[in-house]
Amino acid sequence: MTPPPNRRNPRQERARATVDAVLEAAAQVLEARGLKGATTNAIAERAGVSVGSLYQYFPDKGSLVLALYERHLQQLEPAMAARFQEAEGLSLEAAVPHLIGGLVGLYRARPALHRVLVEEVPHLHGDARTREVEAHLLARVRAFLQARAGEVRHPNPELAASVVVSTVEALTHAAAREGRLQEAELLPELTRLVLAYLRG
Protein backbone atom coordinates (compact mmCIF):
# COMPACT_ATOMS: atom_id res chain seq x y z
CA MET A 1 0.00 0.00 0.00
CA THR A 2 1.38 3.40 -0.97
CA PRO A 3 1.64 5.88 1.94
CA PRO A 4 -0.28 9.18 1.67
CA PRO A 5 1.70 11.75 -0.36
CA ASN A 6 2.17 14.14 2.59
CA ARG A 7 3.52 11.46 4.89
CA ARG A 8 7.28 11.21 5.12
CA ASN A 9 8.92 7.86 4.55
CA PRO A 10 9.91 6.26 7.90
CA ARG A 11 13.42 5.79 6.55
CA GLN A 12 13.60 9.52 5.79
CA GLU A 13 12.27 10.28 9.26
CA ARG A 14 14.97 8.15 10.84
CA ALA A 15 17.65 9.72 8.67
CA ARG A 16 16.50 13.23 9.61
CA ALA A 17 16.42 12.27 13.29
CA THR A 18 19.95 10.86 13.01
CA VAL A 19 21.25 14.00 11.31
CA ASP A 20 19.60 16.22 13.94
CA ALA A 21 21.02 14.10 16.77
CA VAL A 22 24.52 14.19 15.28
CA LEU A 23 24.40 17.96 14.74
CA GLU A 24 23.25 18.65 18.29
CA ALA A 25 25.87 16.26 19.65
CA ALA A 26 28.52 17.99 17.54
CA ALA A 27 27.42 21.37 18.89
CA GLN A 28 27.67 20.13 22.48
CA VAL A 29 31.07 18.51 21.99
CA LEU A 30 32.44 21.58 20.19
CA GLU A 31 31.16 23.78 23.01
CA ALA A 32 32.85 21.60 25.61
CA ARG A 33 36.12 20.77 23.85
CA GLY A 34 36.62 23.16 20.94
CA LEU A 35 37.41 22.00 17.42
CA LYS A 36 40.74 20.36 18.22
CA GLY A 37 39.36 18.42 21.17
CA ALA A 38 36.20 17.31 19.38
CA THR A 39 36.51 13.87 17.79
CA THR A 40 34.03 12.07 15.59
CA ASN A 41 34.06 9.21 18.11
CA ALA A 42 33.01 11.57 20.90
CA ILE A 43 30.32 13.13 18.72
CA ALA A 44 28.94 9.75 17.66
CA GLU A 45 28.90 8.56 21.27
CA ARG A 46 27.08 11.71 22.40
CA ALA A 47 24.56 11.29 19.57
CA GLY A 48 24.00 7.62 20.39
CA VAL A 49 24.96 6.44 16.91
CA SER A 50 27.85 4.49 15.46
CA VAL A 51 30.79 6.28 13.89
CA GLY A 52 29.82 4.59 10.63
CA SER A 53 26.38 6.17 10.81
CA LEU A 54 27.95 9.57 11.42
CA TYR A 55 30.19 9.20 8.38
CA GLN A 56 27.18 8.36 6.23
CA TYR A 57 26.13 11.99 6.55
CA PHE A 58 29.30 13.87 7.48
CA PRO A 59 32.67 12.76 6.06
CA ASP A 60 34.73 14.87 8.48
CA LYS A 61 34.60 17.50 11.21
CA GLY A 62 34.71 20.29 8.67
CA SER A 63 31.44 19.15 7.13
CA LEU A 64 29.88 19.09 10.60
CA VAL A 65 31.01 22.65 11.29
CA LEU A 66 29.60 23.83 7.97
CA ALA A 67 26.30 22.06 8.67
CA LEU A 68 26.10 23.76 12.07
CA TYR A 69 26.84 27.09 10.42
CA GLU A 70 24.05 26.44 7.90
CA ARG A 71 21.73 25.74 10.82
CA HIS A 72 22.79 29.06 12.37
CA LEU A 73 21.98 30.88 9.12
CA GLN A 74 18.60 29.14 8.92
CA GLN A 75 17.83 30.47 12.41
CA LEU A 76 19.22 33.93 11.64
CA GLU A 77 17.03 34.77 8.65
CA PRO A 78 13.56 34.28 10.22
CA ALA A 79 14.70 35.71 13.55
CA MET A 80 15.93 38.92 11.94
CA ALA A 81 12.89 39.11 9.64
CA ALA A 82 10.71 39.10 12.76
CA ARG A 83 12.87 41.78 14.39
CA PHE A 84 12.56 44.07 11.36
CA GLN A 85 8.80 43.60 11.36
CA GLU A 86 8.63 44.48 15.05
CA ALA A 87 10.78 47.57 14.43
CA GLU A 88 8.48 49.06 11.79
CA GLY A 89 6.68 51.35 14.20
CA LEU A 90 9.72 52.26 16.29
CA SER A 91 11.87 55.35 16.17
CA LEU A 92 15.44 55.03 14.96
CA GLU A 93 16.70 55.27 18.54
CA ALA A 94 14.45 52.42 19.67
CA ALA A 95 14.73 50.30 16.53
CA VAL A 96 18.53 50.12 16.32
CA PRO A 97 19.10 48.35 19.68
CA HIS A 98 16.11 46.11 18.97
CA LEU A 99 17.64 44.96 15.68
CA ILE A 100 21.20 44.64 16.95
CA GLY A 101 19.89 42.85 20.03
CA GLY A 102 18.29 40.23 17.81
CA LEU A 103 21.58 39.48 16.10
CA VAL A 104 23.68 39.51 19.26
CA GLY A 105 21.07 37.39 21.04
CA LEU A 106 21.48 34.57 18.53
CA TYR A 107 25.21 34.48 19.19
CA ARG A 108 24.75 34.79 22.95
CA ALA A 109 22.44 31.77 23.02
CA ARG A 110 25.45 29.49 22.41
CA PRO A 111 28.61 31.59 22.71
CA ALA A 112 31.12 28.72 22.82
CA LEU A 113 29.66 27.18 19.67
CA HIS A 114 29.61 30.46 17.79
CA ARG A 115 33.20 31.07 18.74
CA VAL A 116 34.13 27.87 16.89
CA LEU A 117 31.92 28.75 13.93
CA VAL A 118 33.33 32.26 13.59
CA GLU A 119 36.89 30.97 13.78
CA GLU A 120 36.55 27.98 11.46
CA VAL A 121 33.91 28.70 8.80
CA PRO A 122 36.07 31.17 6.80
CA HIS A 123 38.62 28.37 6.32
CA LEU A 124 35.95 25.90 5.16
CA HIS A 125 34.66 27.85 2.16
CA GLY A 126 31.22 28.58 3.58
CA ASP A 127 31.24 31.98 1.88
CA ALA A 128 28.54 31.53 -0.80
CA ARG A 129 25.70 30.90 1.67
CA THR A 130 27.03 33.67 3.92
CA ARG A 131 26.91 36.16 1.04
CA GLU A 132 23.34 35.13 0.25
CA VAL A 133 22.17 35.73 3.82
CA GLU A 134 24.12 38.99 4.06
CA ALA A 135 22.49 40.20 0.83
CA HIS A 136 19.03 39.62 2.34
CA LEU A 137 20.04 41.37 5.55
CA LEU A 138 21.57 44.27 3.61
CA ALA A 139 18.34 44.74 1.64
CA ARG A 140 16.36 44.86 4.88
CA VAL A 141 18.70 47.40 6.46
CA ARG A 142 18.62 49.54 3.31
CA ALA A 143 14.80 49.58 3.32
CA PHE A 144 14.83 50.30 7.05
CA LEU A 145 17.06 53.35 6.57
CA GLN A 146 15.12 54.63 3.56
CA ALA A 147 11.90 54.46 5.59
CA ARG A 148 13.54 56.68 8.23
CA ALA A 149 15.02 59.28 5.91
CA GLY A 150 13.89 62.02 8.28
CA GLU A 151 15.95 60.57 11.15
CA VAL A 152 18.98 59.36 9.19
CA ARG A 153 21.39 62.11 8.20
CA HIS A 154 23.71 59.99 6.12
CA PRO A 155 23.49 61.18 2.48
CA ASN A 156 23.80 57.69 0.99
CA PRO A 157 21.47 55.10 2.60
CA GLU A 158 22.80 52.30 0.40
CA LEU A 159 26.39 52.89 1.50
CA ALA A 160 25.28 53.42 5.10
CA ALA A 161 23.44 50.08 5.10
CA SER A 162 26.56 48.28 3.87
CA VAL A 163 28.77 49.95 6.48
CA VAL A 164 26.33 49.20 9.31
CA VAL A 165 25.92 45.52 8.39
CA SER A 166 29.66 44.98 7.90
CA THR A 167 30.58 46.81 11.11
CA VAL A 168 28.05 45.12 13.39
CA GLU A 169 28.88 41.72 11.94
CA ALA A 170 32.64 42.24 12.28
CA LEU A 171 32.40 43.46 15.88
CA THR A 172 30.00 40.67 16.88
CA HIS A 173 32.34 38.09 15.34
CA ALA A 174 35.29 39.68 17.13
CA ALA A 175 33.39 39.46 20.42
CA ALA A 176 32.66 35.78 19.70
CA ARG A 177 36.32 35.01 18.97
CA GLU A 178 37.46 36.83 22.11
CA GLY A 179 34.82 35.32 24.39
CA ARG A 180 33.14 38.70 25.02
CA LEU A 181 29.62 38.01 23.73
CA GLN A 182 28.13 38.04 27.22
CA GLU A 183 29.60 41.41 28.21
CA ALA A 184 26.83 43.80 29.24
CA GLU A 185 28.50 46.67 27.38
CA LEU A 186 28.45 44.98 23.97
CA LEU A 187 24.92 45.87 22.89
CA PRO A 188 24.95 49.48 24.20
CA GLU A 189 28.31 50.12 22.55
CA LEU A 190 27.18 48.73 19.19
CA THR A 191 24.00 50.79 19.44
CA ARG A 192 25.92 53.96 20.27
CA LEU A 193 28.29 53.42 17.37
CA VAL A 194 25.53 52.80 14.80
CA LEU A 195 23.33 55.68 15.94
CA ALA A 196 26.25 58.12 15.92
CA TYR A 197 27.16 57.03 12.39
CA LEU A 198 23.62 57.29 11.04
CA ARG A 199 22.94 60.65 12.66
CA GLY A 200 26.20 62.11 11.41
Regions found by a protein language model. Name each.
Residues M1-A17:
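N-terminal intrinsically disordered/low-complexity leader segments
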Residues A17, A21, V29-S63:
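Helix-turn-helix
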Residues L106, A143-R148, V165-E183, L195-G200:
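Amphipathic C-terminal alpha-helical segment
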Residues V104-H125, R142, A170-R177:
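Amphipathic alpha-helical segments used for helix-helix packing
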Residues Q74-P78, A94-A109, H125-G150, E158-S162, ...:
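Amphipathic alpha-helical packing segments from all-alpha helical-bundle domains
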